[in-house]
Amino acid sequence: MIYINARFLTQRKTGVQQYALVLCRELVKHIPDICFLTPKTDLIDEKWRGEFNILQIGNRNGHFWEQIELPRYLRSIGNPLLLCFTGLSPAFYKNCYFTIHDMSLYAYPKWFRLLYRAVYKVNYAIQARFARGVFTVSDFSKSEIEKYLAVDSDKITVLRNSVDTSINIKNNIENKVVRRKEILLVGTLEPRKNIEFVINSFLNSQIEGYKLIVVGGLGAAFSKVTFSQHENIIFCGYLSDDDLELKYREASVFVYPSLYEGFGLPPLEAMQRGCPVMASDRASIPEVCGDAAYYFNPEDSSDFSSKLRELIENYDELSPVLICNGYRRLEQFDVRDVASKLMDVISQRNI
């Protein structure tokens, strides 16, 4: 029996939760004996109760559950293999693979609260030493882990983010998609996502007829008050999967301006819906997007504005190329390949 730290099933879905969900949905097709361990809570969506073998344990939640009750339960049943896909894992639990999505708290510590940095740095340092192995989502993140944690390369396995294959990209081809004059951003409103940069650049560019649609929860370090009154800036907050799907399909351009990402899933989600992508040229983003994005310097407002204007003014010529390249790019991120690689790692190490 393999156990999965499924605390992510009790959390609001962002990139790391989406990563875990897509991968776990594929794993259960191939490995019958998987148990998903969660805190006792009513927050779990009923559809996951029907799809996963969920066992609720302990009496607490949050970090206490993850660091105390989860390993206590595992030790009581013989220390079975535990897989953790969303960041933190039980410190000192050795029969474990844990996932580091990025090293932003090392590269840009000012973006994070002191307590957050301390908790994650201690956990990463301990588990990098004691765990069986480390999963990460890109070659860029692997190199960053080696740099900041001094982990041997052989201990790190790259399991890339993958797209949800239940979404049929042929729908974009067979059914004519009506694109609105909308530029879409998706991401938590926090400093590293660089949303404020795009908002200011968009307003200064004075591109007529287009609206900037910002989707994502509000981060503590970012205030929307300054911009919320502008008629061409629309803050949607956190959207349901269905509403976000509609935004991807309606937008003329998807913009991804992050300064630092371990992977960056939203550009692939946009490509899957046939939406042309403009992306930052930093960190892992070129590794992920390849030739399927129109790149810009995320710290140069004039570069962003000129690239956006260029894409819009030459939309009929440039967008089909980006869309076609995007569909081809998606073939590199098939969840079946990721699950197969994970199972190979497990079997090769005689788990």
Predicted regions and their residues:
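Carbohydrate transferase catalytic cores enriched for Leloir-type hexosyltransferases
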Residues: 1-351
